């Protein structure tokens, strides 16, 4: 078992733990220091705003009546299981792919924890330009997006290696 851990992408699981902890610490700080919907402007394009997201990305299905909490929790847990299995299948030589998987796992578990504990996800990072606002997000969402981006990069990197 230890050999499998050392020889596969499972050796990067610490990154998922780091993402989860940073996500939860930042959310705890927001809850402790900002009232719901209170904003602190830092620049002309960025602020911290304490908001609750009852839906998925971009508040998808946020007003669906509560059942979506369990749907999104179930999907996230299933995805984490699948991605962990894929992580186990990676080789020692692969780095970008297991890092991407662990970013996704850590972010997904951070949001699952919120859904189970609160019934919603705490978002607080807001980017905007004049009257155009990107939907609020959090560290977990950022890790998931970065992981997905790295998956795409890895896919094209491996495509180039196969064609040579």
UniProtKB/Swiss-Prot annotation:
Keywords: Aspartyl protease, Cell inner membrane, Cell membrane, Hydrolase, Membrane, Protease, Transmembrane, Transmembrane helix. GO terms for molecular function: aspartic-type endopeptidase activity. The chain crosses the membrane at residues 12-32, 70-90, 93-113, 133-153. The active site is at residues 123, 141. GO terms for cellular component: plasma membrane. GO terms for biological process: proteolysis. Its main location: membrane. It is an enzyme of class 3 (hydrolase). It is found in: Cell inner membrane. InterPro entries: Peptidase_A8. Pathway: Protein modification; lipoprotein biosynthesis (signal peptide cleavage). It is a multi-pass membrane protein. Its EC number is 3.4.23.36. It catalyses: Release of signal peptides from bacterial membrane prolipoproteins. Hydrolyzes -Xaa-Yaa-Zaa-|-(S,diacylglyceryl)Cys-, in which Xaa is hydrophobic (preferably Leu), and Yaa (Ala or Ser) and Zaa (Gly or Ala) have small, neutral side chains. This protein specifically catalyzes the removal of signal peptides from prolipoproteins. Belongs to the peptidase A8 family. NCBIfam families: lspA. HAMAP family: LspA (MF_00161). This is Lipoprotein signal peptidase. It comes from Pseudoalteromonas atlantica (strain T6c / ATCC BAA-1087). The lineage of its organism: Bacteria, Pseudomonadati, Pseudomonadota, Gammaproteobacteria, Alteromonadales. The gene is lspA.
């Amino acid at each position: 078992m230890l050999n499998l851990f050392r020889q596969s992408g499972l050796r990067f699981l610490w990154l998922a733990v780091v993402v989860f902890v940073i996500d939860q610490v930042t959310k705890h700080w927001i809850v402790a220091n900002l009232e719901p919907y209170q904003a602190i402007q830092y620049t002309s394009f960025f602020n911290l705003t304490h908001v609750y997201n009852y839906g998925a990305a971009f508040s998808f299905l946020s007003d669906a009546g509560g059942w979506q909490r369990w749907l999104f929790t179930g999907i996230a847990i299933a995805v984490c299981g699948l991605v962990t299995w894929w992580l186990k299948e990676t080789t020692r030589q692969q780095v970008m792919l297991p890092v991407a998987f662990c970013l996704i796992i850590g972010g997904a578990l951070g949001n699952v924890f919120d859904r189970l504990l609160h019934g919603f996800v705490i978002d607080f990072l807001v980017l905007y330009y004049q009257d155009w606002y990107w939907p609020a997000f959090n560290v977990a969402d950022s890790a998931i997006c970065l992981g997905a981006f790295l998956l795409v990069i890895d896919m094209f990197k491996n495509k180039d290696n196969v064609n040579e």
